[in-house]
């Protein structure tokens, strides 16, 4: 099915200088798509400039030509081959193929450059309850130009985790780096024959973040201080501390955190009912999660961590790191070079948040007052 929607074209940005790094203040997008999304859960730019967008609420993956406004669908909703339910992340593979995270069907699917489904494989690489350790769950965080998948294993506890590179062609897993994890809050309900265990980090957790470059380098964004290290095949580069004024957590920031968690938080549910183990994956708050959490009953930090969990490496090799800002303030991004230094900054218009960086520019999601999402592209070259 093909649909046509208008895209309007304009371009505007303001350039200023800040402490050794050029700052771009984006004002108007080069392209804003008129199509209304219920949500934008996954995004990627194709080699010909078209883009793919996964809307997990509407159960659709759209292929969009921003130059003409032409939109068609990739696959369709359902449980069968080439179908998906609650489509989520989209990642580039060689020959313009795409890896789709299919949360509702608990699997990942590969579509070739023409949009044809090629294969699917499960998110859980093992069976729940089959061994003493946690089930290996693969939620991709990035891919490189060779098609290797990078992920951070879920579960296991402790204050550190691993960045793992999965080379499917060689059937090999390699640990690329170790990262700091926040403590988890565990809640258990039910009886011995029907037990439900839920784990979640505290509000605004202090933890490392990371992103993958097309050439396979991994940017490690370190906490509690703020610096960027690079891990590559030829060695590691340790960056210098980057100044980060504290952002106090007040009532508005608490409300912001709860809203973002309800809309975008990833839930993994493993239930054991009389020996029958099942797993569910979902994005956002589920209907069976119970009453809304009481913000006053939660332990809040005095300030946000220096950076959020949003980061991306563009085709030019620069890392984009989303800085923490006050609630309802414009989002700000540090551009980090190969030595771990800040080489530029970008400030987005209010209500915009980065979803990807490609050869054509930087892509942002705009959510309006009614919760409708729009896709915008800005020229930041």
Predicted regions located by residue number:
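Bacterial N-terminal signal peptides
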Residues: 6-16
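N-terminal secretory signal peptides that target proteins for export/translocation
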Residues: 1-3
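Eukaryotic scaffold repeat domains enriched in small/polar residues
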Residues: 19-381
